[in-house]
Amino acid sequence: MDEFYELLNEYNKTKSIFSEKAISIIKNSIKIIFEKTQVKAIYWTQYTPYFNDGEECTFEIHSILVSTDTLSTFDEDEKSSNTYAIDYLDSKVFSDYEIELISNLVRILQDEDIAEVLKFSFGDHVAITATEEGISIQDHNHY
């Protein structure tokens, strides 16, 4: 029995180290975007849907947006004209290099293997806003 709990303890330590490193990489990617692009804020929601047509409801990242305005939070109903959904990054606004940096972060955030870390680190049913000042977390209603 002791062997099992030693193994479980080792697993939890490794998981914790992985989570810390993964969040550090995400925060560093965000920092680089702020330093090397015109992006001033990054926003996303993350939650487990309440209902999914009978399929299993799984935690996911949703609504990733970037803004060239300095915002402390995003209002999804009142997006500024300088706020862009990541699926529609305008090459007239963003350079190929900027789009590449943003896309690299998006790939990390949308990787299903990192979902558990994001849920543990930031929560479920939340909206995340990242600015140069840091990351803020608000409750998010997604009915």
State where each predicted segment sits.
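Acidic interaction surfaces
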Residues: M1-Y143
